[in-house]
């Protein structure tokens, strides 16, 4: 399970060190793809494969479904962390997420998200008020 917030730095070669506590779950490989809200999503390879099979089963008669599947698959980059736990983020991924040197990696239960640190701070400020309201609507009394 992926939980918590971490602040690794992106190096000049586009490499990002993943939090040590998650490396065991990612030794079988991982997939980096575009995420929501201009973040990057990092899935264990098996989790991404399961989600891809689910997406492939959706009818492609809908333009929205076709666009989603195309964007998801076209932006997917399969990787294995190196011995230091680093992954290399493509120029396209770094550009999409607006990544600078300062990054934030957050656990999203079954996958990770990579954010530019300033973008994450802004997102948190903008969504903080909705957090309490969302509990009842989205999670039915989780907290």
Curated annotation (Swiss-Prot):
Keywords: Cytoplasm, DNA-binding, Repeat, Transcription, Transcription regulation. Forms oligomers. The keyword Cytoplasm applies. Pfam families: MraZ. GO terms for molecular function: DNA-binding transcription factor activity; transcription cis-regulatory region binding. This is Transcriptional regulator MraZ. The keyword Ubl conjugation does not apply. PANTHER family: TRANSCRIPTIONAL REGULATOR MRAZ. GO terms for biological process: negative regulation of DNA-templated transcription initiation. Residues 5-47, 76-119 form the SpoVT-AbrB domain. Disulfide bonds: none annotated. Its main location: cytoplasm. InterPro entries: MraZ, MraZ_C, MraZ_dom, MraZ_N, MraZ_sf, SpoVT-AbrB_dom, SpoVT-AbrB_sf. Belongs to the MraZ family. Signal peptide: none annotated. GO terms for cellular component: cytoplasm; nucleoid. It comes from Corynebacterium efficiens (strain DSM 44549 / YS-314 / AJ 12310 / JCM 11189 / NBRC 100395). It is found in: Cytoplasm, Nucleoid. SUPFAM superfamilies: AbrB/MazE/MraZ-like (SSF89447).
């Amino acid at each position: 399970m992926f939980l918590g917030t971490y602040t690794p730095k992106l190096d000049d070669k586009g490499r990002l060190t993943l939090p040590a506590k998650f490396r065991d779950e990612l030794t079988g490989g991982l997939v980096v793809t575009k995420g929501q809200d201009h973040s990057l999503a990092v899935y264990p390879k098996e989790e991404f494969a399961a989600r891809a099979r689910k997406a492939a089963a959706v009818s492609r008669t809908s333009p929205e479904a076709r666009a989603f599947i195309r964007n998801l698959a076209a932006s997917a980059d399969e990787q294995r962390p190196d011995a230091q736990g680093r992954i290399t983020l493509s120029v396209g991924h770094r550009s999409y997420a607006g990544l600078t040197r300062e990054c934030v990696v957050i656990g999203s239960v079954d996958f990770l998200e990579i954010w530019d640190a300033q973008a994450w701070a802004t997102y948190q400020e903008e969504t903080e008020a909705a957090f309490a309201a969302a509990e009842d609507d989205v999670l039915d009394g989780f907290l």
